[in-house]
Amino acid sequence: MSIFPTRDSRDLSSRRRSLIDWEFPQMALVPLDQVFDWAERSRQSLHDDIVNMHRNLFSLEPFTAMDNAFESVMKEMSAIQPREFHPELEYTQPGELDFLKDAYEVGKDGRLHFKVYFNVKNFKAEEITIKADKNKLVVRAQKSVACGDAAMSESVGRSIPLPPSVDRNHIQATITTDDVLVIEAPVNEPNYKAIKLSPEKGLAIQPSEVQERQLAVKNKEGLEIVTAEDGSKKIHLELKVDPHFAPKDVKVWAKGNKVYVHGVTGKEEKTENASHSEHREFYKAFVTPEVVDASKTQAEIVDGLMVVEAPLFK
């Protein structure tokens, strides 16, 4: 299925401002307090946000370079057999997959959306075609320019990984007046109750506080890869958490092929003659052999043990 972009009468800055200046619908599936918090902090950092968006635009490249770039990304996402995978020995640097951390936002329909941006300067909307398949999003642009009696053809494109949770039947694409192609689509059935949005960490998950566990416990601290009967894979992470940390004090998020866990809590007591403050914090990072589908992450804390599960995708 091909998607053809339409023209937007606004530039990227105006479009971004409209996203955070409208009244969020009461039927929003993302918890409203989180939506308002995300919107307020986004308003405060709007200028920096726009600068970063322009800096991180995907560029279109000649087809050969495009294929090589996607092949490089897919190698970065290649699976490693669980028995050969040792997270403590792995080391990764920021790469092309890091865009996934910031690729989720609340849409005007109150749902979680996957959204990416491309630089399409010098191309018209009718010269651009977008296709989505099982594991990637492909943008192609082609035009011919008359040069005397001859015609020169320019063909460029870009492929990026597309999470399986993205609703491929509702992908929309628009081009702003400053030549930015915006592609977005809702996410299928994300874990709305646990979602936490922030400009700093992007999409994060807050562990649930449950009386009875929904996730299996293996009593083996650390991260491992579990393969289901249908061949799909997911991470299973168990981590002991100090009793001082409530579920609301802990956040889990993914960036590229790493999963991060951050907990912070504190209290301040004041009397007439003295004051006392207490601050506790921990930070953990785990490398995964593939990329985590962050919108489908589940996490819970019971009796000081946190369990996290999230599907992987290639």
From Swiss-Prot:
Domain of life according to the entry: Eukaryota
sHSP domain: residues covered: 95-200, 216-314
Molecular function terms, GO-annotated: unfolded protein binding
A Gene Ontology BP annotation from the UniProt entry: response to heat
A single GO cellular-component term on record: cytoplasm
Pfam families for the chain: HSP20 (PF00011), Tsp36_N (PF20894)
PROSITE patterns in UniProt: SHSP
Keywords from the UniProt entry: Chaperone, Cytoplasm, Repeat
Subcellular location(s) of the protein: Cytoplasm
Note: Not precipitated by antisera from cattle infected with T.saginata, suggesting that the protein is not accessible to the host immune system.
Quaternary state and interactors: Homodimer and homotetramer.
Family statement: Belongs to the small heat shock protein (HSP20) family.
UniProt protein name: Small heat shock protein p36
